[in-house]
A protein has these predicted regions:
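A short, charge-rich alpha-helical start-of-domain segment used by transcription regulators
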Residues: 21-45, 134, 146
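Amphipathic alpha-helical segment used for protein-protein interaction
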Residues: 26, 116-151, 155-165, 207-209
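Short, basic/polar amphipathic helix motif occurring as a linker/hinge flanking DNA-binding modules
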Residues: 95-118, 125, 193-198
């Protein structure tokens, strides 16, 4: 899967996404394909962090619902990302209920060896959370922390939008994301001042929407 965008990068496409969604609602199939290409990488990363290897199947189910209900959507590009994330989350939770399993951590020893080293910057350490092995580590977090990190870092939602997806207050989502990132920093082997640096960057990155 490679790297998926950080929130700042994802949001750069919100204008194009909003325009594509509007055209798609008027029946433009090419515009729907553009919206899919913009949203799918982050959505798939979000689902990988919840259901692991079944993410592709769950994403397919989610996109069927998205296409079916597209005419009901009202909002801009950022709103569309939040709306699609809500649908994908519902499908993921349905999938987990059918499996009756709890997501498990799946990182390997080699994965840990390849994580950010002590000489990496705090920003690089945060960036590393978007790689596929990191999504496996995120799956091992408590559910509230995992979903908060995934929605903020992988999908690129702001605080209020992530809170709407989860049905929680923005402050609660921000706290869960901060705690999740701090726990991941420990798993990455980043301790002491470096760990605090990562979580400080996380606080700025994952703070309330500007």
């Amino acid at each position: 899967m490679g790297q998926v965008g950080q929130p700042r990068r994802v949001q750069e496409y919100d204008g194009e996404l909003g325009a594509a969604v509007a055209r798609a609602q008027d029946g433009d199939e090419n515009a729907f394909a553009i919206a899919y290409r913009i949203v799918q990488p982050g959505l798939l990363g979000f689902l990988r962090g919840i259901v692991g290897d079944d993410a592709e199947d769950v994403a397919s189910d989610a996109w069927l619902e998205i296409a079916r209900d597209l005419g009901r959507f009202r909002g801009d590009g950022a709103g569309f990302r939040g709306w699609t994330a809500t649908i994908a989350r519902h499908r993921a939770l349905d999938h987990l209920r059918r499996r009756r399993v709890r997501p498990q951590a799946g990182g390997t020893d080699q994965d840990v060896l390849d994580l950010a080293g002590p000489h990496n910057t705090h920003e690089q350490a945060l960036e590393s959370l978007s790689t596929e092995w990191a999504l496996e580590l995120i799956r091992g977090l408590p559910r509230d922390q995992a979903e908060a990190v995934l929605l903020r870092v992988v999908v690129g939602l702001d605080g209020p939008a992530a809170a709407r997806v989860l049905g929680k207050r923005p402050g609660a989502v921000r706290t869960a994301a901060h705690r999740g990132l701090k726990r991941l920093a420990r798993q990455l082997g980043i301790g002491g001042e470096a760990e605090e640096g990562v979580t400080d960057v996380a606080s700025r990155t994952l703070g309330e929407s500007k």
